Regions:
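A cross-family "folded-core" feature that marks the main globular domain of proteins
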Residues: 1-125
Length: 125
């Protein structure tokens, strides 16, 4: 039932068709599974940070599957995030590898940076 509700939420918020909705929902669940396995934690799905992560994943997946990735602009900030949050960046790398392998899509440095920030927040919550 939770999966069915999630499908309707994604559909309502992103205004996508059923196949796109299923693709996005499946993608989000697989990313969450990667995160849980990487950190070996149970995520607090009631937390504000988890809610923000889910919102990020919804729009991230929509950009990804419509080939509208963000442009790399602030390389210094990207480097700082990568260096200061190396463990979380490692999780983002796992997600990047999954996306490349399953969908043959690449992530920009900016997408990696934002993903890393969200991963840091949910992994310490």
């Amino acid at each position: 039932e939770a999966g069915f509700i999630a499908l309707h939420i994604v559909n309502a918020e992103l205004d996508t068709n059923m196949s796109g909705m299923i693709k996005i929902t499946t993608f989000m669940q697989e990313v969450i599974d990667i995160v849980k396995n990487y950190y070996n934690i149970v995520l607090n799905e009631d937390s504000l940070d988890f809610g923000r992560f889910i919102t990020h994943l919804k729009y991230f997946s929509q950009r990804l599957f419509s080939n509208k990735s963000t442009k790399d602009t602030d390389f210094q900030l990207q480097r700082m995030i990568r260096e200061n949050y190396s463990k979380d960046y490692g999780c983002a790398e796992k997600i990047k590898e999954y996306i490349k392998e399953k969908y043959n899509l690449n992530l920009t440095g900016e997408e990696m940076m934002f993903l890393t920030i969200h991963l840091k927040r949910i992994s310490t919550n």
